[in-house]
C-alpha cells in the first residue's frame, strides 16, 4: 500500500491508500509537521479522482439525504470578496428553496461563510436531528463543519499556518452531513471542476460547478465563468456575468478588512450596497436554475435581485434569526 512517502514524492495513490492516508494523518498522535507535509504535497501535485474518493470513503458517512440545495465555494481564490455563497443561500431560501448549507470559518480569506452567520447571531445546530428541524421549520440551516466532522479541528492550525488552499478546501463542499441532493459548488481550481463533476455524478447528485475565468470561485461579474452542469450526464458551458449584472465595482465587494467585508455583506443582502446586491443575485442564479425556478441565468438573476431589493431576502434572514433565538441549545 502506498502512503505518505509516495505523496510527498509527488506520486498518485489508489483509492484504498488515500483512505488509509487520511486515517493516519487525522489521528491525534500524528504531528502537525507530517500533516503539513501531506497537505503541501497535495497542493503541488493535485488530487486525482481516486484519491478524492478515498478521502470521502474515510470521512463521509451521511445517515440521511434531503431534498435541498447546498451552495458553497472552495475558497482560496485570494479575491477577498464578500461571502457571497451564504448571502445567496439566504436569498434562495427566501424564494422557497430549501437550503442546507455546510461551511466553516475562513482559513485562507478575510471572511468565511460561518463568520457571516456568527456575526448575524446564528447559533449553529449540534447534530443532524437539530439540523433537520431547522431546515424543516425555516427552509434553511447552516451546519458548522468542525461540529459534524470533529477531525477537522485537528487540521485547523496547520491550514491557517500554510495559508494556501489545502485538500480540505476541496473536500469541504461535498461533505454536507444532510447529503442534499442538489449542489452548487464554486471552485478556485480548474482541475477540481472535473473531479467534482465526476464525483457528484457518481454519487447521483444534481449539481452546477462554477469557476470564474479570472480565478474567482464564484460566478464572476468581471469576466466569463466556466460552468459544468451535472444531472445524470455532464454538460459544459460558459456564462458572461458582465452582461448579466452590469458594471459591478470591485471595491464595493472586496476588501482585506474583515469588518468592511462584513458591512458589504449585510448591506448587499439589504440592497443598500447595489454592487454587492448584484454580486449576490448573480450567484443565487445557479441555485434557482438547479431548482427549476428560472430557465436561464438572466431571468434567475432578475428574480434574485428583486428578492433583495424588495426586502424579501433580508426578511428571511431576520426570520431565521428570530427562530434561532429559541433554539440556542439545539
From Swiss-Prot:
Q: How is the cofactor bound?
A: Binds 2 magnesium ions per monomer.
Reaction(s) catalyzed by this protein?
N-(5-phospho-beta-D-ribosyl)anthranilate + diphosphate = 5-phospho-alpha-D-ribose 1-diphosphate + anthranilate
Q: How is this protein annotated for GO cellular component?
A: cytosol
Question: Keyword Glycoprotein on this protein?
Answer: no
Keywords on record: Amino-acid biosynthesis, Aromatic amino acid biosynthesis, Glycosyltransferase, Magnesium, Metal-binding, Transferase, Tryptophan biosynthesis
The keyword Amino-acid biosynthesis appears for this protein = yes
Identify the residues that bind anthranilate 1.
73, 104
Q: Where does anthranilate 2 bind?
A: 159
Q: Residues that bind Mg(2+) 2, according to the entry?
A: 217-218
Which HAMAP family does this UniProt record tie to the protein? Answer: TrpD (MF_00211)
What quaternary arrangement does the UniProt entry report? Homodimer.
Alphabetized NCBIfam families for the sequence: trpD (TIGR01245)
Question: What is the recorded name of this protein?
Answer: Anthranilate phosphoribosyltransferase
Amino acid at each position: 500500500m502506498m502512503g505518505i512517502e509516495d505523496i510527498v514524492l509527488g506520486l498518485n495513490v489508489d483509492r484504498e491508500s488515500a483512505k488509509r492516508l487520511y486515517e493516519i494523518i487525522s489521528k491525534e498522535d500524528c504531528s502537525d509537521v507530517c500533516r503539513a507535509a501531506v497537505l503541501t504535497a497535495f497542493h503541488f501535485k493535485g488530487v486525482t479522482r481516486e484519491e478524492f474518493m478515498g478521502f470521502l470513503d474515510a470521512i463521509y458517512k451521511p445517515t440521511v439525504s434531503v431534498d435541498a440545495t447546498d451552495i458553497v465555494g472552495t475558497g482560496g481564490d485570494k479575491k477577498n470578496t464578500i461571502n457571497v455563497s451564504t448571502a445567496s443561500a439566504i436569498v434562495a431560501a427566501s424564494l422557497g428553496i430549501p437550503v442546507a448549507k455546510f461551511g466553516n470559518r475562513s482559513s485562507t480569506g478575510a471572511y468565511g461563510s460561518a463568520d457571516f452567520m456568527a456575526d448575524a447571531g446564528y447559533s449553529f445546530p449540534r447534530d443532524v436531528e437539530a439540523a433537520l428541524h431547522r431546515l424543516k421549520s425555516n427552509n434553511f440551516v447552516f451546519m458548522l463543519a468542525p461540529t459534524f466532522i470533529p477531525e477537522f479541528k485537528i487540521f485547523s492550525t496547520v491550514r491557517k499556518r500554510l495559508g494556501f488552499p489545502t485538500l480540505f478546501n476541496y473536500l469541504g463542499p461535498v461533505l454536507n452531513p444532510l447529503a442534499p441532493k442538489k449542489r452548487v459548488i464554486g471552485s478556485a481550481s480548474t482541475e477540481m471542476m472535473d473531479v467534482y463533476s465526476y464525483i457528484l455524478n457518481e454519487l447521483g447528485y444534481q449539481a452546477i460547478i462554477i469557476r470564474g475565468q479570472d480565478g474567482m470561485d464564484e460566478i464572476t461579474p468581471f469576466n466569463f465563468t466556466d460552468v459544468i452542469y451535472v444531472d445524470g450526464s455532464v454538460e459544459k458551458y460558459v456564462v458572461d456575468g458582465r452582461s448579466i449584472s452590469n458594471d459591478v465595482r470591485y471595491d464595493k465587494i472586496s476588501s482585506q478588512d474583515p469588518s468592511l467585508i462584513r458591512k458589504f455583506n449585510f448591506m448587499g443582502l439589504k440592497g443598500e450596497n447595489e454592487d454587492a446586491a448584484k454580486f449576490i443575485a448573480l450567484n443565487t442564479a445557479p441555485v434557482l436554475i438547479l431548482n427549476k425556478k428560472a430557465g436561464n441565468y438572466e431571468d434567475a438573476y432578475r428574480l434574485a435581485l428583486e428578492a433583495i431589493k424588495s426586502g424579501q431576502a433580508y426578511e428571511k434572514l431576520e426570520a431565521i434569526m428570530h427562530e434561532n433565538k429559541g433554539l440556542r441549545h439545539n
